[in-house]
Amino acid sequence: MVVKTWMPWLLVSSVLSQGCCQHWSFGLSPGGKRELKYFPNTLENQIRLLNSNTPCSDLSHLEESSLAKIYRIKGLLGSVTEAKNGYRTYK
């Protein structure tokens, strides 16, 4: 008797969980579909950006976060101590 009432509730809960977790991204269109009227503008902007002759070497505005620096140093120190202990990591 318990199994007979348990199975329909399991089915209903699984269907409801899928229904309420549906991803609606751009303009409430399912699957992230965009209207075609926006496509030429973005495509033209991308082509214009690719054809621009601006140098990309100026990266002074980008800074590494302190947390990223800590993890990078931690990885470096870990590899140095493993090398001293005779461990070798193969990738």
UniProtKB/Swiss-Prot annotation:
Q: Where in the cell is it found?
A: Secreted
Q: Which domain of life is it from?
A: Eukaryota
Residue list for modification Pyrrolidone carboxylic acid: 22
Molecular function via GO: hormone activity
The tissues where this chain's protein is expressed are given as: Expressed in the cell bodies of a cluster of neurons in the preoptic region.
Record carries keyword Signal: yes
Query: Gene Ontology cellular component?
Result: extracellular space
Residue ranges spanning the membrane: these are: none
UniProt-listed InterPro entries:
GnRH
User: Could you confirm whether the keyword Secreted appears in this record?
Assistant: yes
Glycine amide: residues bearing it: 31
Q: Which UniProt keywords apply?
A: Amidation, Cleavage on pair of basic residues, Hormone, Pyrrolidone carboxylic acid, Secreted, Signal
**According to the UniProt entry, where is the signal peptide?**
1-21
- What role does it play? Stimulates the secretion of gonadotropins.
Please tell me what else the database record remarks about this protein. Teleost species possess three paralogous GnRHs: mdGnRH and cGnRH-II have been identified in tetrapods; sGnRH has no tetrapod ortholog and is thought to be a duplication of cGnRH-II.
Q: Record's family?
A: Belongs to the GnRH family.
Protein's name according to its UniProt entry = Progonadoliberin-1
